[in-house]
Amino acid sequence: MSLADFDQLMMRRALDLARLGTGYARPNPLVGCVITHEGRIIGEGWHRQYGGPHAEVNAVAAVTEQHLLPRSRAYVTLEPCSHFGKTPPCADLLIDKGVAEVVVCNLDPNPLVAGRGLQKLRDAGIQVETGVLEAAGRWLNRRFFTVQEKQRPYVVLKWAETADGYLAGPYFQTVPISGELARVAVHQWRTEEQAI
């Protein structure tokens, strides 16, 4: 397997991990991290809940053989943060642990980060690669990107009406209109969205 194929495989795993934060990490983005050493996963994590440790912190903590970190490669779905917020900067953690390479899916559009995390890594001598599965990462965090880039919420509109154009039953009685699949989809959206 080529390095490019391996990078995509590991980033897919990181994206899968990031999805586990759905409904818990908001309003923060969904972030996953996989750490490898010589082609083997040695640690992985995701941002489990708002205010809690970020994906990189959880992935580093999961590494049982910490001595391997200086020769490791970290795959992160979003640029490691570079500022103090509810948690310390993840870029600093990766630098302190001596991670050799960092592969990033998307740059963080948040003005507090916006390239500063990657610059910190590069200034520390860490090799950085960006844009691996970038479109998949943007789709996963479309809500976060919309808020950061457009300063507005991500909007989902669900519309259902009867065959004759009504939105409810007679006398505004609640009746199912769109069926079971739509009901399941709406409940999924309610888990993912920040407002209804």
Predicted regions and their residues:
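Glycine/alanine-rich phosphate-binding loops at beta-alpha junctions
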Residues: 2-70, 78
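Local cysteine-cluster metal-coordination motifs and their immediate loop/turn environment
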Residues: 46, 53-54, 74-93
